[in-house]
Amino acid sequence: YAQEPYFHFCEELYEKCPDGVSLHGFFQSWRYFHNVEDELRKDYTFHEGISEPCKEMMQELDGKEPIMLHVRRGDPNLTDPRGFKWSYTQCGAQHPVQPIDYYEKALSKFDAKQPVIVFSDSVEWVKEQEFFKPDRFMISEPEDKYADGSFTPYADLCLMSLCSHAII
């Protein structure tokens, strides 16, 4: 068992961690993975069945580079492994849900004609917001679903990877 002590790169953990241990933490630094970069890039390359439809969608934008905008609200009915109900709408200061003006301010830095693809775990909420109504916005609604009815993430991830900018 080895625990990452903080959220940035820990050289001591990287250099001295024994093989065969269970790692715990977020490991958000690229420095943990630079020695296996090629293998990771290969493993995380979308196969043609996923990438081709996404590329076709991008071609419909007539060469305009889209902005990826992700709205994270969380499912108000989520239950963690301990049985506690939670969602980002209930997390307050730790994981605040961004108000619409956050997205307005972020988008003001871009050309108003640049298309925006909106991704969300709360698609119905996004559709209800007047802010996302103009033609500039396309709301991603993956067709593939898991048995429980939740959307599969791979098409959204592929589309996000093809966007030129990201607002999260």
Which residues does each predicted region cover?
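Donor-binding and catalytic core of enzymes assembling or modifying cell-surface/extracellular glycoconjugates
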Residues: F110-I168
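Secretory-pathway luminal glycosyltransferase catalytic domains
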Residues: Y1-A112
